[in-house]
Amino acid sequence: MSVGMAAPRAPYSCDPDRSRGRLVAEPPSRTRSPFRRDCDRVIHSTAFRRLKHKTQVFVFHEGDHYRTRLTHSLEVAQIARALARQLGLDEDLTETLALAHDLGHPPFGHAGERALNRCMEAHGGFDHNAQTLRIVTTFEQRYPDFDGLNLTWESLEGIVKHNGPLHEAVPSGIADFNARFDLELWSYASLEAQIAALSDDIAYDAHDIDDGLRAGLFTVDDLREVPLLEAMIGDIDRHYPGLVDLRRGAELVRELISYLIAAVAAESQRRIERAQPMSPHDVRRHAGPLVAFPADVAEHEATIKRFLWQRMYRHERVMRVMRDAERIVADLFGRYQADPASLPAGWLEGCDSEGDRARRIGHFIAGMTDRFALTEHHRLFDSTPDLR
């Protein structure tokens, strides 16, 4: 089959007509499948809109063209749908999981998550996947008959298990919900969820290269340190001699995305043909993931990640901003603990213990955008770092 062509629906895909349903039963939609309905609910949620002002690597006011969690999620969804189409899987469920995967991230990217996890260490820590589950099952308040978005079992399973089974140290937010609606934490997730997870990796690799080039943290020729990228750059230079770096970089990103999508599709098809799953049940009970990079491509992908770690994520300019961002999150947490009156009215209502209060404060901070966190810090402190 040609790359990009839609395969017939596979027997191991998740069939919306055979969904395991929702925690709160609802009448079916006259115009949309259950998974399309899930996707639309994510898109229309408040948490999804907030991703517009949440950091990937660069803080929101560093430039209008850098990725945010919103643009990243859209790019993950585009890649995931392409893979789902080639493998005969449900595109709507795949898109739902791609769009929802970052809903639980706090402000300031991984720096914000590290800081919030440290602040909450004595109270169970902070896990962004558990926070995503809380958002879609409790925190969104948009419907008269239920809290959250009341997503299907398949969407909730994919949100929780897209990176694999949860055997040990299950975050309390996930364990508590699982007691009400068993997501079979011990098993692998659907192929749709596995695709969403790999698509996240593909989008990160390609688009962090794009943002790093745009920020001047490295050049196209610096990327020749990565053997796979050196070969791609050589091909680009032969086909387009004298091309300016802006266009060389853009062409490299396109080539990389296409290469990784094709590699994942081919390897996943090989694994599926060996395993011969005949249903989503077979996929979940398989001994390992069925969506993956081939071994040689996985090595190339790891080399790209090492390059980005050394030249971008550990760059002093980025590190300085992230240190200041961690300080902002820690300052806010400490102030809200010491002075609950600085929180919005009613936010700690019903909290009977220090742990309850700490977790509620953590939820409040996790929901902030970068911009709101900075505004709050300005309101509560005499001096706020300039994240530039």
Curated annotation (Swiss-Prot):
Q: Does the keyword Hydrolase apply?
A: yes
Q: Which family does it belong to?
A: Belongs to the dGTPase family. Type 2 subfamily.
> Under what name is this protein listed?
Deoxyguanosinetriphosphate triphosphohydrolase-like protein
Taxonomy, top ranks, is:
Bacteria, Pseudomonadati, Pseudomonadota, Alphaproteobacteria, Hyphomicrobiales
Disordered: where is this region?
1-35
Pfam families in the record: HD, HD_assoc
Q: Which GO terms describe its biological process?
A: dGTP catabolic process
Domain HD per the UniProt entry, residue ranges: 69-205
What NCBIfam families does the entry give?
dGTP_triPase, HDIG, PRK01286.1-1, PRK01286.1-3
Q: Which PROSITE patterns does this UniProt record tie to the protein?
A: HD
UniProt entry keywords in alphabetical sequence: Hydrolase
Record has Hydrolase as a keyword: yes
Q: Name one GO molecular function term.
A: dGTPase activity
